[in-house]
Amino acid sequence: MRQAALRTWTILGRVLGVVCLVAIVLSGAVPAEAAESGPFGWPLRPRPTVERRFDKPERNWLPGHRGVDLAGSAGQTVLAAGDGIVVFAGEVAGKPVVSIDHPGGLRTTYEPVTAKVAVGSRVVRGTAIGTLVAGHEGCPAAVCLHWGARRESGAHNRREYVDPLGLLHEVPVRLKPLEP
């Protein structure tokens, strides 16, 4: 009898813990200090919805999605995700783009963004770098920011596309089964 009661309380405690964890995850609550820590942050505020995720191509010339699409609104201010130097502010294939070089061979790109900064400008995380405009095709939202990142490494200046969400150092919550 006593063993059955103990088992019931153990199961009830686990269920309650999972329910609380799920409620926290679904609320999207992130402590302010966690949201603002680390060298990189979100390029849009408030924290945007990720409409399309990173899909690394097998080779740089093959199909894939070399960044993430973040839901925004036309005219919204776009922020530098981290400290760096603006290396490009202009048009690529008719789309306005801003690119920033960061320490360690990292470059982030923001598109379609009308620049408020000039090439050579030093920026810090959170600096307004431009204004989001409509026109990013392939995004399910009416207006999206395409945020990309790539790293140059090695003696041959090899370029590797990386998931910009990985720069945020947010640890995703993963629920594990109670029983193996």
PLM segments and residue spans:
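Acidic, glycine-rich catalytic/binding loops that coordinate metals and/or anionic ligands
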Residues: R2-L6, A35-T49, A71, A118-R125, ...
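Bacterial N-terminal signal peptides
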Residues: V15-S27
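C-terminal region of N-terminal signal peptides and the immediate post-cleavage residues
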Residues: I24-S37
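Short glycine/threonine/proline-enriched tight-turn/helix- or strand-capping micro-motif at secondary-structure
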Residues: T49-A80
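Short, acidic/hydrophobic/Gly-rich beta-strand patch recurrent on exposed beta strands
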Residues: V68-L70, V97-P103, G148
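Short, well-structured beta-strand-loop connectors
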Residues: T77-V87, V117-A134
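Zn2+-dependent peptidoglycan hydrolase active-site motif and core
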Residues: A81-K116
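Flexible, gly/ser-rich surface segments that form the specificity/activation loops bordering the active-site cleft
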Residues: V87-E91, P96, T127-L145, S153
